[in-house]
Amino acid sequence: KIQMDKLKNTMTMSVGVNYKGVGRMVYPGIIQILSFLSMNPQTHQKAFHDQILREINGEASEVDRHNTFYDEYLAVMDMTAEFYLSTVDRIFKNREIALNKFSIDNKKIDIENIQNTAVFIIEGANDDISAPGQCLAAVKLLKKLPKNKKISHLQKNAGHYGIFSGKAWRNEIKPKFLKFLDNNNYDC
């Protein structure tokens, strides 16, 4: 297991002199996107190789599928170091939500007592970041929430990014999500 001080020293840095927020400690967005790209390097390499060939052959455009996808996928921003480190420490290492020990501003959030809302869980069958079943397991902590207020959807052939982007989102997930909002009287 990586220690938090090592994570702080290797994954955060201060904002440079020529930028707003100079000196502020952040988890740079570029580290996050490089981490995502490194998980499937062959896929991304092939996508850019094929796009270069389309450019050479005059078959590419600014709004083609490749450019549209990567314009969004590569749009990242820095996170405050405090938020990043706190999330890693509290949620992933110490499992505060899973153990029902989560608090905000020193006020304990009793997850088992949540009852006046509805929850829609969306997971991707091919998610290589948050394995399918993690969100569903967390919903079991909502013991006072009626079953009809707990909805889950496992999207076939979708990964971590794909559940909120592209065809799977537009054609399958979004319609179910909008129906969920309507059924639970949520105004958007």
PLM regions with names:
Residues K176-D187:
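C-terminal alpha-helix
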Residues V63-F69, T117-A118, Q155-A158:
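Short acidic (Asp/Glu) and glycine-rich catalytic loops that position anionic groups and cofactors
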Residues I129, H153-E172:
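Catalytic histidine-centered segment of alpha/beta-hydrolase-like enzymes
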Residues D128-A137:
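Conserved alpha/beta-hydrolase "acid-adjacent" motif
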Residues I111-N116, L142-K147:
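Short, conserved loop/helix-junction motifs that constitute active-site signature segments
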Residues K1-E82:
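Alpha/beta-hydrolase-fold enzymes
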Residues I114-Q115, F120-E123, D127:
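Short beta-strand/loop motif that positions the catalytic acidic residue
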Residues K93-I111:
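Active-site nucleophile elbow and catalytic-triad environment of alpha/beta-hydrolase enzymes
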